[in-house]
Design a protein with these regions (language model features):
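PLP-dependent amino-acid enzyme catalytic core
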Residues: 1-262
């Protein structure tokens, strides 16, 4: 069993909307501190930091990882080098939310500008400063792997798992346990192409525009009563409704933070 509980729900209304037999939802958004896709891995990550007072992260503006870290490590300053990604009101809401956190210093600009700033600081690294991998990727972690195993035991091996892909860590963890998985790419086009080439089981190199994703997530909210984000989950659900034929049983991983009204 995992230290953090695995929340699994079955939703007949979503199944009807997607025209499939069954839909199971893995509700990572219900994990503590707002949840989200890296919540399990971050729980382990924070225990491995010694004498660290500053964490530097190059990711998207209003990063979910920075959002979670600020709660888990209230005495550590999080330096976010945030890149614009065309997220509309959701990007503005997340950016504003992080700006209001006392232990987050957020700079936002183009990918090129923020990459230069991040790498310049890394070259000048001082004791007490930790620089995360680009995008906040944490690689393999046993907690997430355990949650994947528990989910498969609960829903059965005939469910096809669908995950939103940013770094690809979750997709890799699920793919270790089953071939029945699709990772829906969510990044800007250039990164999507690179991930499509490098990540097995990835799909969705062409994603819907933001307005379409927002419309999709409003429809999902009408069905589920949940406000999930239009960037990651919006890309995932837009991908699913565009598919002419889906596996009859879907296990969808909800990996955005909870409680963000956009």
């Amino acid at each position: 069993m995992t230290t953090l509980k695995t929340h699994i729900e079955f939703d007949t209304n979503l199944a009807r909307w997607l025209n499939v037999q069954e839909v199971a939802l893995v509700r990572e958004d219900l994990l503590p501190n707002g949840g989200g896709k890296k919540r399990r891995a971050l729980a382990q990550f924070v225990t491995e930091l010694e004498d660290v007072k500053h964490i530097h992260l190059l990711s998207y503006a209003g990063s979910h990882t920075a959002y979670t870290l600020s709660s888990l490590l209230p005495d550590v300053m999080i330096h976010l080098y945030g890149t614009h990604y065309g997220g509309g009101l959701y990007e503005k809401e997340m950016t504003s939310m992080l700006d209001s956190r006392a232990n987050i210093i957020q700079k936002v600009s183009s990918s090129w500008t923020m990459s230069l700033a991040f790498n310049r600081q890394r070259r000048e690294s001082r004791p007490g400063h930790h620089f995360m991998r680009i995008g906040g990727s944490l690689g393999f972690d046993f907690s997430t792997q355990s949650a994947v195993e528990e989910t498969i035991r609960t829903v059965g091996e005939d469910f096809h798992h669908v995950v939103a892909v940013a770094s690809g860590d979750l997709l890799t963890s699920v793919a270790r346990q089953t071939n029945q998985v699709t990772g829906v790419l969510t990044q800007p086009l250039g990164i999507r192409i690179l991930k499509y080439i490098s990540l097995k089981k990835s799909s969705g190199i062409w994603k819907s525009g933001l307005n379409k994703r927002i419309k999709t997530m409003r429809a999902v909210r009408e069905i589920t009563g949940q406000t999930w984000d239009p960037i990651f989950m919006g890309t995932l659900f837009s991908y699913l409704i565009k598919k002419k034929k889906l596996p009859p049983k879907l296990c969808i991983w909800i990996t955005c933070p909870a409680g963000i009204d956009w």
